[in-house]
Amino acid sequence: MDDESDDKDDTKSFLCRKSRNLSEKKRRDQFNSLVNDLSALISTSSRKMDKSTVLKSTIAFLKNHNEATDRSKVFEIQQDWKPAFLSNDEYTHLMLESLDGFMMVFSSMGSIFYASESITSQLGYLPQDLYNMTIYDLAYEMDHEALLNIFMNPTPVIEPRQTDISSSNQITFYTHLRRGGMEKVDANAYELVKFVGYFRNDTNTSTGSSSEVSNGSNGQPAVLPRIFQQNPNAEVDKKLVFVGTGRVQNPQLIREMSIIDPTSNEFTSKHSMEWKFLFLDHRAPPIIGYMPFEVLGTSGYDYYHFDDLDSIVACHEELRQTGEGKSCYYRFLTKGQQWIWLQTDYYVSYHQFNSKPDYVVCTHKVVSYAEVLKDSRKEGQKSGNSNSITNNGSSKVIASTGTSSKSASATTTLRDFELSSQNLDSTLLGNSLASLGTETAATSPAVDSSPMWSASAVQPSGSCQINPLKTSRPASSYGNISSTGISPKAKRKCYFYNNRGNDSDSTSMSTDSVTSRQSMMTHVSSQSQRQRSHHREHHRENHHNQSHHHMQQQQQHQNQQQQHQQHQQLQQQLQHTVGTPKMVPLLPIASTQIMAGNACQFPQPAYPLASPQLVAPTFLEPPQYLTAIPMQPVIAPFPVAPVLSPLPVQSQTDMLPDTVVMTPTQSQLQDQLQRKHDELQKLILQQQNELRIVSEQLLLSRYTYLQPMMSMGFAPGNMTAAAVGNLGASGQRGLNFTGSNAVQPQFNQYGFALNSEQMLNQQDQQMMMQQQQNLHTQHQHNLQQQHQSHSQLQQHTQQQHQQQQQQQQQQQQQQQQQQQQQQQQQQQQQQQQQLQLQQQNDILLREDIDDIDAFLNLSPLHSLGSQSTINPFNSSSNNNNQSYNGGSNLNNGNQNNNNRSSNPPQNNNEDSLLSCMQMATESSPSINFHMGISDDGSETQSEDNKMMHTSGSNLVQQQQQQQQQQQILQQHQQQSNSFFSSNPFLNSQNQNQNQLPNDLEILPYQMSQEQSQNLFNSPHTAPGSSQ
């Protein structure tokens, strides 16, 4: 039993282990398959990676993707007007397409750093072609200075990392940019573009040296623009970059459908052998706009551009021969009435039973206009057979021959003749068309190589084959410079070709492009019709003047030759009407009967042609000009010449046709010419009679046979009747009557009557004399004005001279003031020297007084010494000097203060006591001191000191008086009064200073009141020194 249980356990464990191994193997296989899928997505090479490397690469990729997403969110448009399901790039592309604009970034030196792809549809340039150009290369030359001024005075510049852009940083300007494209248009083809953007500092752009700029490094142009060469001093910030959008103000509707998703730019369709739609792919509606049920059963040719039909037909012929192929670039009309460029790869699918062609499978691919431009440039470089013919700068003929592997096509482009004059120059047209004939002879051997409008008689050719015509008017030729004062002429193109190639224009829209073969005529404006009518009137006037001149010359002949003259006039008239190259507007032409005969042999008129005629060429459309229909001879009621080869002049009998067939239009035209001929004949006869009368009168007046005309009076009714009668007789004569209704005769110096010519000469002489008098008076007036201006200039110079003299006087006064200041400084120095001498004397006096004070040692007055000085006379003299000047001069006041401050130091109490005693004895000898002075020597010493003191004070007073006199003299010289001389506040201050101090003690001596008052008033005249 134990063995059986062990066996059961083993089998269970085995089964569990086996199932576990299977599940692990399944998990490993699934993990390996996932790792292989990741390696196929991550790895960029065919080398096999291990599992760990695949996982590491996946983690790194996810990190980078998340970081890029976070970075893009910073610059993502967060406004509400942007749909959430559109990315930033898609929304920007759609905005540019809807605004008909493009983005451009260029530096201050003009180098273009970036241009969006939408510039190709707007101006016809590829973005990579613009990177080697500058904005000055595209801009109109007259706008270069405005562009330079914009960069020299920029608006507030945005920093490199600044994201908040306000309207204050925005700048708007207009300029004209040259158009590009497949065809080399004129140099004047410019479009007005509005730029809106801002300036930004580019940290990557360095200023660089001149050598770097010349080498084209650091984003600078290799060659400086012409505006910088003309203005070498112009300084612009080379780190400045303009970022903005440009919008063409008059869009030329150059569009191709922009496909955002690159995977949805092709679709598939099936066509029958008659090229009708049998099937349309589900990818087609987003591209062409049509649903499958809308196009099934319709022909593909209904959606192709008219200019591309010939190349498409040639490609389909090649498809029928080879069974497969690739079409050229062609335009397809979408449901939104836009033209998109397509290229198709197709092959023929055969029936499985009878092996006959069943249908054609086409794979259509949308191509951009840039690719079309590249392909056209490559073909142009390969062919190299384009030639341009220019005559006098007024007409331009472009003959180009393009060869390809699919179909050989020869295309000749004829620009309209732009004639500066109103009349058509036949020689210019003949030369241009002669060159055209030689150019097309190589590609079309069946066409006669003689010029279409040849003025020489050429032998008729055996055969004449005229190729069909095609005309188109591209939208790019609407106007070269729009919205400006420059509006060049519009161009029209006429094509001559045998097999039409891919010569379509890239600038067509459904609204202005030709969509059917019947609309082949070019547009003739009313202005051109007016020019042709003016041309006819001009020739009629010329014919009238010529006949008039001839008749004047023939009046001297005899009357016998009148019939012969009339015959000659008729011949001249016929020659003029036949030989004049006039374009006659066409009236509605009815059906005509065709004569049997050769294709290019036209019956001639019944009379010989005086000169070879010029007939409008056959490439011009029938609705515009009266011409012969190619390949179908028609008899005209007036003399014409064959279009390609006029026949030589033959006899009248040989050129008479058997039958003449005329349309109603031709018969009507013949009637008009006959009536005009009759009117001209009558007019010629009338003029002959008038000229004969005038010549007779002139002859009589020359020999004074004609008497002066008498005065005649006319009534108003008679005057009008006579005037009307004369006008009816002559048609061009006018009558002028004076106010008195009389003709006033005039006579010359010999007494002969003056005729009208002499009277006119006299009037002209009088007019000349009046003009000379007027010129003389004007000259005198000009001389007077010049004299007045000369006198005004003299007065002005005198005033300037007076001003200069006044300035010189002011300078002299300033110099005098400086000299006076120097003198005052010298006086101050002298006073300081005198004060020093006085101080030395005071020191000697003080030494003697100290001896006396030491002996006495008395101090009755304590407060009096602070206000008194040793020299009362000096103080009183200073006070008098100050009161005399009265503050008239601040410098003098300062000198007085300096004098007061330079007094000797104050004495002590003993000195003051001695001074009081001296003053008391001087004032009154009756003062009794209760002290005895026993020393006799002291009295004698005091007397000596007094004598010295009085002599020093006298010297000081004399010096002060001299100073006062000098100051008075200076005041008289300056002649100016000072405000401070009459200032009462300064005097009041001095008076306040003269008052007694309040801290004086009562003297303990016996003296009278008057003596005490004199005692205390005399030493305090100048207390300012103690303050």
Swiss-Prot record:
Subunit and partners: Efficient DNA binding requires dimerization with another bHLH protein. Forms a heterodimer with Cycle.
Pfam families linked to this entry: HLH (PF00010), PAS_11 (PF14598)
One GO MF term attached to the UniProt entry: protein heterodimerization activity
Compositional bias segments (type: Low complexity): 383-402, 504-516, 552-575, 871-909, 951-995
Originating species: Drosophila melanogaster
Protein name: Circadian locomoter output cycles protein kaput
PROSITE patterns assigned to the protein according to its UniProt record, in alphabetical order: BHLH, PAS
Record carries keyword Disulfide bond: no
Segments of this protein annotated with the region Disordered: 377-402, 443-575, 765-800, 869-911, 926-1027
N-terminal signal peptide: none
Domain comment (free text): Contains three polyglutamine repeats which could correspond to the transactivation domain. The length of the repeats is polymorphic. In the arrhythmic mutant JRK, deletion of this region leads to the loss of circadian rhythmicity and altered light response.
Broad class of where this protein is predominantly found: nucleus
Polar residues bias spans: 443-486, 1006-1027
Region (Implicated in the circadian rhythmicity) residue spans: 780-1027
Domain PAS: 88-160, 255-321
Alphabetic keyword roster: Biological rhythms, DNA-binding, Nucleus, Repeat, Transcription, Transcription regulation
Interaction with E-box DNA, annotated site positions: 20, 24, 28
Expression sites (tissue/organ): Widely expressed. Found in head, body, and appendage fractions.
Gene Ontology process terms (BP): behavioral response to cocaine; circadian regulation of gene expression; circadian regulation of heart rate; circadian rhythm; eclosion rhythm; entrainment of circadian clock; locomotor rhythm; negative regulation of apoptotic process
